[in-house]
Curated annotation (Swiss-Prot):
Family assignment from sequence similarity: Belongs to the class I-like SAM-binding methyltransferase superfamily. RNA M5U methyltransferase family. RlmD subfamily.
Cystines in this chain: none
The protein's name: 23S rRNA (uracil(1939)-C(5))-methyltransferase RlmD
Underlying gene: rlmD
GO biological process, one term: rRNA base methylation
Catalysed reactions, as listed in the record: uridine(1939) in 23S rRNA + S-adenosyl-L-methionine = 5-methyluridine(1939) in 23S rRNA + S-adenosyl-L-homocysteine + H(+)
Its biological purpose: Catalyzes the formation of 5-methyl-uridine at position 1939 (m5U1939) in 23S rRNA.
Residues at which [4Fe-4S] cluster binds: 75, 81, 84, 163
EC numbers on record: 2.1.1.190
Active site: 406
Pfam families, A to Z: tRNA_U5-meth_tr (PF05958)
């Protein structure tokens, strides 16, 4: 396609692409153009690579007017690697854009504005990613094995030798890992390596589609000893993961404010950013404002990340999770921290929960909801139904709900139900910059009911 423009960029979309709009010959607004690499306030020349009747997708060719928020990306692989999409934007501007995405979704999808916009939660911009899934490919044309993230909008693996968002000691492992995998008998049968960094242990889970040989075992042991890491193997599905070497180490992360240590497996869901998780926990518990005599409910509780801190503030906490394995792990973590007498856990499918199911749980004073990207639609509908039933059923509704979200669109959808149909008000909302340099928007909202 030929170079086109100039085009004024007015905003960013959910993938951090600049958004501009063409003007028709009669002066009316024309189609939208999504421009990779362009920032709000910039005027650019662009080249389209996909043209549709109502929009075009393009890349920047030349920047005629540059945004004051544009910075030089720290990573030399930015633009090729798909792991980050916003390194060219100042970190404060990144947070501001994410806050606007949250507020726009709440308004456009639910016609809601929070009573209070919380100050954003932010932390380190680099070296924060303590959990990641790296793809492995043997590519003869590139000289051997590649280990890293996918190229942007591609199934190919980026030829990367470092990563600025991984902890430095993990970034330094990328090249040695390429060399290690190249020496293994299963070099063509290892599609991914999963990374989990704990307080004192770094674990790498090798997805081995075939059994490893004795020679492979020796290579892995030597590598683990030299680089001070722990290898796990996953021959089949997630439930087949087991520690290979060394066996005397346990992954943990800590929540010092609450005196809690959380053991976990490398394939468990844990927050990617441990520093932000601590700040998020502190703010969530303050907003929950649990009293010593309260009964609390934690939905989508995972391994007990919120449940256990909540138990240090209240009389009783119940955690509900859809995974039997995570429910078992949460119970073990409660015992590990001496909180098993104040906590209970149940495995339920929260995507199919009904009003009767919620009523059967009994009265809880305050709830915390931390769903995956799909949100908590069934839970929100159940609360709306109980509210509209009136009488004793409505009395079961909690007076306060803290909703931690990793998808502002599903948060907005659920917020609409909670406010317009369940009788809550949106007391506050704000973003949590859990994933700097990406377009991922984590947020927290508070709902109150009189």
């Amino acid at each position: 396609m030929p170079v086109a423009g100039p085009l004024d960029i007015v905003s960013l979309d959910g993938e951090a692409r600049g958004i501009g709009r063409l003007t028709n010959e009669d002066g009316t607004p024309g189609k939208v153009v999504f421009v990779e690499g362009a920032l709000p306030g910039e005027r650019v020349m662009y080249r389209s690579h996909r043209v549709k009747p109502s929009y075009e997708q393009a890349g920047v060719v030349n920047i005629l007017r540059q945004s004051a928020s544009r910075v030089t990306p720290q990573c030399k692989f930015f633009g090729v690697c798909g792991g980050c999409s916003m390194q060219h934007l100042d970190s404060r501007a990144q947070v501001a854009i994410k806050q606007r995405v949250l507020e726009d979704d709440l308004w456009h999808l639910a016609k809601l504005r929070p009573d209070v916009v919380f100050r954003p939660i932010a932390g380190p911009d680099w070296g924060y990613r303590y959990r990641a899934r790296l793809t492995v490919r043997h590519v003869a044309a590139k000289g051997g094995v590649l280990v890293g993230f996918h190229e942007r909008k591609s199934s190919y693996v980026a030829d990367m030798t470092s990563c600025e968002v991984l902890p430095p000691h993990v970034s330094a492992l990328l090249v040695p890992l390429r060399e290690l995998v190249g020496r293994l008998s299963i070099v063509q049968r290892m599609p991914q390596i999963e990374l989990a960094v704990g307080q004192d242990v770094t674990a790498l889970v090798l997805r081995n589609l075939e059994p490893i040989t004795a020679e492979d075992e020796a290579e892995l042991r030597a590598f683990a000893d030299h680089h001070n890491i722990q290898f796990w193997l996953q021959p089949k599905g997630p439930d087949t993961v087991y520690p290979f070497y060394p066996l005397d180490r346990t992954l943990t992360y800590t929540l010092p404010e609450f005196g809690i240590t959380m053991p976990f497996k490398p394939t468990d869901f844990t927050q990617v950013n441990h520093q932000i998780n601590r700040v998020l926990m502190s703010r969530a518990l303050k907003l929950l404002d649990a009293q010593p005599g309260d009964r609390l409910l934690d939905l989508f509780c995972g391994i007990g990340n919120f449940t256990l801190p909540m138990a240090t503030r209240a009389r009783e906490v119940m955690g509900i999770e859809g995974s039997e394995a995570l429910t078992t792990r949460a119970l073990a973590n409660a015992q590990h921290n001496g909180l098993h007498t104040k906590t209970s856990f149940a495995c339920r499918n929260l995507f199919e929960v009904s009003a009767d199911d919620v009523a059967a749980l009994g009265k809880f004073d305050r709830w915390l909801i931390d769903p995956p990207r799909e949100g908590a639609l069934a839970v929100s509908k159940a609360l709306a139904e109980l509210s509209q039933s009136g009488g004793d059923a409505a009395d079961l509704l909690p007076k306060r709900i803290i909703y931690v979200s990793c998808n502002p669109a599903t948060l907005a959808r659920d917020a609409g139900l909670l406010v317009h149909e369940a009788g809550y008000r949106l007391a506050g909302a704000g973003v949590v910059n859990m994933f700097p340099h990406t377009s991922h928007v984590e947020s927290m909202a508070v709902f109150e009911r009189d």
